[in-house]
């Protein structure tokens, strides 16, 4: 696939898309989440790019929604679908599903939709979906406690490119390596020449390090899981709640995630926790140990009776000796006990092991002094030892965890993709169930154009434009149970007549919604739908008021263009007569109907001038009617399903008929009716409607 041939994709965007692992696969699948990981591409832009790629794949010329009202209907039904999603991804993904005239595209989505309608779900699944989001790329990693070392300049450049997470140092000899070991917890020597050297510290000779970067920097693979920890856990929860087949071992992945914090550090290891706590508490524990020793020594001094003869006191003064000498001579045991108390407190407070305890004991000298003070150098040495031990432990645990999770990465990606796609499926399933939808039946043949006929289809199917049984418009702002189901079938071009507020516009909305959803490949709100595959949908809403000359000219020109190329089109028009005076409107509409009929288009024109239009047309125009059964308590009783080949009575005719019936019954006026308002007057009016 030539990326720049996708509508809306230029050189810069194409370059960004090539950064994806499999851009063509993502584009063909409409994988918005993957496309949105390309540099500089948002989810909204990804949806538009995916839609363009799908059009290219199916040789779809676009333009199915040929008018503003047709596009508005699409936006409205799309909004109904999107309102039933949980994730932002699913809402964007639904925008890649659009009405198309291409059979291959429709059938692709139909297969997806049929599977979706079979999905079972409950609130547990929907709740779990709330935590699922597309995976994010981890940020740049910088590991400061490790470094790479080499004596070769070329190797140095290779190392910087292969493992940018670590510093790379040039060393000339073993002494240089030893100096690095004093500044880093771990030094990885890249040169075979360093094999066998003995150096204090953690020095590893790994000539293969650049070929196995994950072993040297386990933070690299772990950063992916750390950054997406909550997203992955949510995807696991979705799979369990929905009883989905998983692309990876859920138990193993969950166990790995439980051992990893969101900052990329290893979690749940007691020894690592001990070392971390010891480092954090070292300064406080050393200070407390000092206080413990001094408190012990002060108490001992208070309780001890010290007797010094004059000659001894004179000798101490002459030697310049102070209290330290006095402690050494008179309170040696008490001082030793105080120091031992400090040492034990430091060791116990930090939970030090034997080797660490040996260093800690040296923090308090055996040489008597008051007050007792810790040796700062020894405390620093202990900190270095603890830090090095922690880094060694963390490094080993990270390598082990990275190895455990290494085989889970692609499966984890698929796990999230499947969870997000489930949200798309459930949105379709919820829409289908809430509006009692069914999958439509297309009656055209194998051609790619909806206007092409097939010799294999039945005679009844060959003629149908659309046939809707038990349809309920999803655009009505009413509960589904409050909407009367509508049956309507049209072949060719028909006029639709009916009383005011009888549901003519709602019928057009129903037809438009059904046709749009069907060409999207989605279920439609009806008991059964058969229709041909159309090339485009022209839906013209009712014009508010008479148009001025310029607007009138533009409207007529638009219909002239449509009439010239109407084959394969579905044309829905609501009261076109409102554009000008009734007489002229009837003539114009008759001419448009003639042209559309000659060109094989399918159309429904709502009009109150059906009788006049039929008289002016040069062919037998089909007139259907939404019939009112009568007036009850001032309200129309209407059969919402259009009656075929029937000119419906108008609202004025129904009112006059009602008045005539009432006039024939004097009791309705409490007595005899004057001649001027008698039944004869209303009967004469009724004759005018014949």
Map each language-model feature to its residues.
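ATPase nucleotide-binding head domains, primarily ABC-like/P-loop NTPase cores
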Residues: 450-690
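Alpha-helical coupling/stalk and coiled-coil linker elements that connect catalytic or binding modules
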Residues: 2-5, 18-22, 33, 57, ...
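Short, charged amphipathic alpha-helical surface segments
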Residues: 35-41, 53
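Helix-turn-helix-type domain boundary/helix-start signal
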Residues: 4-7, 39
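A basic, often C-terminal nucleic-acid-binding module that engages the phosphate backbone, implemented
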Residues: 49
């Amino acid at each position: 696939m030539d990326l720049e041939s996708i509508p809306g994709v230029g050189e810069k965007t194409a370059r960004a898309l090539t950064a994806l692992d499999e851009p063509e696969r993502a584009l063909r699948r409409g994988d918005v989440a993957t496309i949105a990981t390309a540099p500089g591409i948002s989810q909204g832009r990804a949806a538009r790019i995916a839609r363009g790629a799908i059009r290219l794949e199916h040789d779809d010329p676009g333009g199915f929604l040929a008018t503003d009202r047709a596009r508005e209907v699409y936006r409205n039904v799309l909004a109904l679908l999107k309102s039933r999603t949980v994730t932002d991804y699913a809402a964007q993904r639904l925008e890649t599903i659009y009405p198309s005239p291409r059979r291959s595209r429709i059938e692709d989505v139909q297969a997806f939709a049929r599977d979706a309608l079979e999905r079972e779900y409950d609130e547990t699944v929907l709740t779990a979906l709330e935590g699922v989001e597309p995976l994010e790329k981890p940020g740049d990693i910088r590991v400061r406690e490790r470094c790479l070392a080499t004596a070769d300049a070329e190797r140095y450049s290779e190392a910087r490119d292969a493992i940018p997470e670590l510093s790379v140092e040039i060393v000339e000899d073993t002494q240089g390596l030893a100096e690095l070991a004093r500044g880093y917890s771990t030094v990885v020597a890249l040169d075979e020449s360093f094999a066998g050297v003995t150096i204090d510290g953690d020095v590893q000779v790994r000539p293969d390090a650049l070929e196995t970067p994950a072993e040297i920097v386990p933070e690299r693979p772990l950063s992916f899981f750390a950054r997406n920890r909550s997203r992955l856990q949510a995807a696991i929860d979705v799979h369990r709640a929905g009883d989905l087949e998983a692309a990876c071992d859920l138990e193993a992945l969950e166990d790995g995630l439980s051992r990893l914090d969101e900052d990329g550090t290893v979690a749940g290891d007691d020894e690592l926790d001990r070392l971390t706590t010891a480092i954090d508490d070292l300064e406080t524990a050393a200070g407390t140990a000092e206080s413990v020793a001094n408190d012990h020594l002060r108490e001992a001094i208070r309780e001890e009776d010290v007797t010094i003869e004059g000659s001894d006191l004179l000798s101490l003064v002459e030697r310049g000796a102070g209290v330290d000498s006095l402690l050494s001579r008179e309170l040696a045991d008490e001082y030793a006990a105080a120091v031992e108390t400090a040492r034990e407190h430091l060791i116990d407070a930090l939970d030090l092991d034997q080797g660490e305890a040996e260093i800690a004991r040296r923090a308090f000298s055996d040489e008597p002094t008051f007050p007792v003070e810790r040796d700062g150098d020894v405390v620093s040495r202990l900190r270095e030892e603890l830090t090095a031990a922690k880094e060694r432990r963390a490094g080993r645990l990270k390598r082990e965890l990275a190895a455990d999770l290494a085989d889970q990465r692609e499966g984890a990606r698929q796990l999230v993709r499947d969870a997000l796609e489930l949200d798309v499926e459930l949105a379709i399933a919820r829409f289908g169930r809430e509006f009692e939808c069914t999958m439509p039946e297309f009656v055209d043949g194998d051609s790619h154009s909806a206007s092409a006929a097939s010799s294999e289809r039945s005679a009844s199917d060959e003629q149908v434009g659309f046939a809707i049984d038990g349809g309920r418009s999803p655009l009505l702002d009413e509960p589904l149970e409050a909407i009367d189901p509508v049956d309507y079938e049209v072949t060719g071009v028909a006029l639709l007549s009916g009383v005011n507020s009888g549901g003519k516009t709602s019928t057009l909305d129903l037809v438009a919604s059904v046709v749009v959803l069907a060409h999207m490949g989605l279920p439609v709100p009806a008991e059964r739908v058969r229709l041909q595959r159309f090339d485009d949908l022209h839906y013209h809403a009712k014009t508010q008021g008479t148009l001025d000359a310029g607007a009138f000219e533009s409207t007529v020109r638009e219909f002239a263009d449509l009439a010239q190329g109407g084959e394969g089109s579905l044309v829905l028009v609501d009261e076109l007569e409102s554009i000008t005076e009734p007489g002229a409107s009837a003539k114009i509409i008759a001419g448009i109907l003639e042209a559309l009929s000659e060109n094989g288009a399918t159309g429904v024109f709502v009009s109150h001038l059906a009788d006049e239009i039929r008289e002016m047309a040069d062919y037998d125009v089909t007139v259907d009617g939404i019939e009112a059964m009568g007036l009850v308590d001032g309200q129309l009783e209407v059969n919402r399903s259009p009656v075929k080949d029937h000119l419906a009575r108008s609202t004025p005719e129904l009112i006059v008929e009602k008045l005539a019936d009432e006039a024939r019954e004097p009791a309705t006026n409490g007595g005899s009716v004057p001649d001027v308002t008698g039944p004869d007057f209303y009967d004469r009016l009724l004759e005018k409607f014949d």
